[in-house]
């Protein structure tokens, strides 16, 4: 939307600025004519994007960005698997991982295979035809949007020193994470995304 008024201590925005962000921490109100928002949860809307395009970004794109960059510590050349690559978060995750120059394997359903390829995936696994946890290939980073495999199964395909990040909240990651980190050098991490000024603009960088 467009900023109408700002508080006395607001420094990042002024009336007339076009902004986008997340209102979930401020009582929601996206369908209202006017809404009150914390400046920490907003960013200036890029001029080359519409309001509809930017409205789709704060949760899906930020979840993917924080999962891969902040929690996953993604690096150039890593083998990255995205489980649940056909949804909003997964689609952004493919593109973000490729921006980091990683080798990306996307896991999705049959109708979404071509979509995953178009978004940049190097390899695509149709989960209706193949279970990635039963393959010999190992991954440096697994970003899990679905949470439909056990930690034992995930452990088999996670490389030594690798990271497993789940945005679907994994009980296994919560309870076994400290033990796996101490004994096997693998990190199991749950992600609760939090849109903010540090990450919202980054989601529109490319």
Provide a role label for each language-model segment.
Residues 15, 55-126:
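Mid-domain Rossmann-like dinucleotide-binding core that forms the NAD(H)/NADP(H) cofactor-binding site
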Residues 1-26:
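Glycine-rich beta-strand-centered segment in the early N-terminal region that forms part
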Residues 26-39:
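A structural motif shared across PLP-dependent enzymes of the aminotransferase-like
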Residues 14-15, 50, 75, 159:
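Residue-level recognition of short, solvent-exposed, well-ordered loop/turn junctions
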Residues 20, 125, 140-143, 165:
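N-terminal Rossmann-like NAD(P) cofactor-binding module of classical short-chain dehydrogenase/reductase
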Residues 8-9, 104-115, 148-151, 171-172:
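Short glycine/proline-centered loop/turn elements that form peptide/ligand docking sites
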Residues 146-206:
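Glycine-rich phosphate-binding loop and adjacent beta-alpha segment
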Residues 133-141:
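A short acidic, Gly/Pro-enriched loop at the edge of an enzyme's catalytic core
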């Amino acid at each position: 939307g467009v900023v109408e008024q700002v508080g006395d201590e607001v420094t990042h925005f002024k009336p007339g600025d076009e902004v986008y962000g997340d209102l979930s921490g401020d009582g929601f109100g996206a369908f209202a004519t006017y809404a009150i928002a914390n400046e920490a949860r907003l960013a200036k809307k890029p001029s080359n994007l519409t309001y509809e395009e930017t409205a789709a970004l704060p949760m899906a794109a930020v979840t993917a960005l924080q999962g891969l960059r902040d929690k996953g510590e993604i690096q150039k050349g890593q083998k990255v698997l995205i489980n649940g690559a056909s949804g909003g978060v997964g689609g952004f995750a493919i593109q973000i991982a490729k921006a980091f120059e990683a080798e990306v394997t996307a896991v999705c359903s049959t109708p979404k295979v071509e979509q995953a390829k178009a978004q940049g995936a190097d390899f695509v696994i149709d989960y209706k035809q193949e279970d990635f946890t039963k393959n010999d290939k190992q991954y440096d980073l697994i970003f899990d949007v679905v949470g439909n495999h056990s930690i034992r199964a995930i452990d088999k395909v996670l490389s030594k020193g690798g990271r497993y990040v789940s945005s679907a909240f994994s009980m296994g990651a919560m309870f076994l994470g400290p033990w796996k980190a101490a004994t096997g050098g693998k990190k199991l991490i749950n992600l609760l995304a939090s849109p903010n000024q540090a990450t919202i603009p980054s989601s529109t960088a490319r």
